[in-house]
């Protein structure tokens, strides 16, 4: 009986730790092998991958290669983005996410956020997001705002500004 009680007590004490003490994808300090990728915009025409530095302004162009550049973000910018992603708690989002299932628009935006830490990867895909970037709940608004904050950082780089203007605009 003592063994059973000891086992139950140990289970009650340790079970929460096993379910909640797993190492976070984004620990407090920026991991050496942290990287992220973001796809954003109308139909997901723009993208950036910090692993390769590839920054794409648009894939909808006569010559898409003209709209591609490479940018290595500074350690300070990477740390700023890391803090935004950590505050988002990306692990709490499902792989397929709709920030506002009650809202839609045509055209619509895609937001695809991938975070890598070594061999651990988490991707959250939000397709057909209303271009008003509204969300039904605060969690959805946090996801949208984080993605837009990161895209603002990327579109503020000199490399982005040096790319040609869009050929096509969506009505």
Predicted regions: what is each one?
Residues 1-4:
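Positively charged n-region of N-terminal signal peptides that target proteins for export
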Residues 19:
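Polyanion-binding surfaces on beta-sheet-dominated domains and ring/shell assemblies
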Residues 23, 74-102:
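Charged, amphipathic alpha-helical segments
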Residues 23-37, 98-171:
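Short, well-ordered, aromatic-rich surface patches in folded extracellular/luminal domains
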Residues 23-72:
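N-terminal export/targeting and maturation segments
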Residues 69-72, 80, 122-126:
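Generic detection of short hydrophobic beta-strand segments and adjacent strand-loop junctions
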Residues 70, 74, 78, 140-143:
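Short, charged, low-complexity patches
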């Amino acid at each position: 009986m003592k063994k059973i009680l000891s086992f139950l007590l140990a289970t009650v004490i340790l079970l929460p730790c096993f379910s909640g003490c797993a190492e976070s994808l984004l620990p407090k300090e920026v991991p050496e092998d942290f990287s992220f990728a973001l796809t954003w915009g109308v139909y997901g025409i723009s993208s950036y991958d910090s692993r390769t530095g590839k920054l794409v302004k648009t894939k909808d162009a006569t010559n898409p290669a003209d709209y591609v550049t490479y940018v290595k973000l500074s350690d300070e910018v990477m740390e700023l983005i890391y803090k935004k992603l950590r505050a988002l708690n990306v692990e709490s989002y499902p792989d397929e996410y709709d920030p506002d299932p009650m809202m839609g628009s045509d055209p619509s935006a895609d937001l695809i956020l991938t975070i890598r830490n070594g061999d651990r990867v988490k991707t959250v895909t939000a397709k057909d997001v209303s271009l008003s970037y509204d969300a039904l709940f605060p969690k959805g608004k946090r996801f949208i705002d984080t993605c837009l904050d990161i895209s603002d950082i990327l579109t503020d780089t000199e490399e982005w500004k040096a790319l040609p203007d869009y050929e096509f605009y969506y009505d």
